[in-house]
Amino acid sequence: MPIIVRSAEVENQAIGTGVTTQSLLSPKNTGSDNVLLDLITFGNGAALDLTLKADTFGWLQVVDGSGSLAGYDLHLDPDGVTYLPLGYVGAFTAATDGTRLLMATVPDAVRFDSDVAETPSELRTTDWSREPVLQSEHDERTRIYMATRTLTGTSAYRGEMIRYPSGTQAPAHHHEGAEHFQYVLKGNCTALLAGKTSQLSAGDVLYNYEMEVHSFLNDSDDEFIFVEFFVPGGCKTVWAPGASPCAWLPTGADIMGRPPSRDIGYHVHGEEKGI
């Protein structure tokens, strides 16, 4: 069965001066070490060493606030997702009080990318607000890629942002070959998980194992937005009988209506080679 973690109910643990963390995903609650996920909260000017083990890489997403990584000249804010290379050494310093940082790590990353030794050794930040917005062919959802092999240099994980306008529903489906999680950024929805309904709200995490049938209905008045990450990045998507495969069409714009930083053509979910 999928696992729902409500961050509002997870204990905050102090791990430094002005820094607390909440363990959202770990082997303790998922039974899996494909991906570990922590939500870290900082006071203004507080810093935390984010050094990774030699066999581990990961990524960061600022949920609220802003900050910087030591030796990296790019300021980090909620518009970016930053790839942390294998064995990264460095610290994050918050620029505002209440900065929240979503940090995911993939231990023993060679399990998911046999060419892990060839992955980029430098930090990489994807400004998702400049990435192309893709429109679902059969409903009102939109998608923005946040992490792909093209963007990060590895196929060990893949990330995207999905937006559901009010009243939007996607068909039931499951994935084969990867586990994945959704972190809700905004809004509420009804999730249909293995035939049972559950409510998801901002701050919740849904962890899906392989073969878990799931779908979402935004039955609220506001937009429902989540980010989802697959480990490994490549997997097969199987749609429920009678459902149309989820295909995505280019809109020719980024989330602000500007020309996007690159072009992505029509494709079906699960066939994202080269994206």
Where are the regions a protein language model picked out?
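Conserved short histidine dyad/triad with adjacent acidic residue
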Residues: 21-26, 36-53, 147-148, 160-175, ...
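Asparagine-centered strand-capping/turn motif at beta-strand->loop junctions
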Residues: 92-96, 216-220
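Short, conserved beta-strand element in jelly-roll/cupin
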Residues: 39-42, 52-68, 161-165, 174-191, ...
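A short hydrophobic beta-strand segment most commonly corresponding to one strand
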Residues: 39, 83, 97-113, 207, ...
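A short, N-terminal "cap"/entry segment at the start of jelly-roll beta-barrel domains
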Residues: 1-34, 98-100, 104-156, 241-275
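Short acidic-glycine-tyrosine-enriched beta hairpin
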Residues: 72-87, 195-211
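Surface-exposed interaction/gating patches
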Residues: 135-177, 185-188
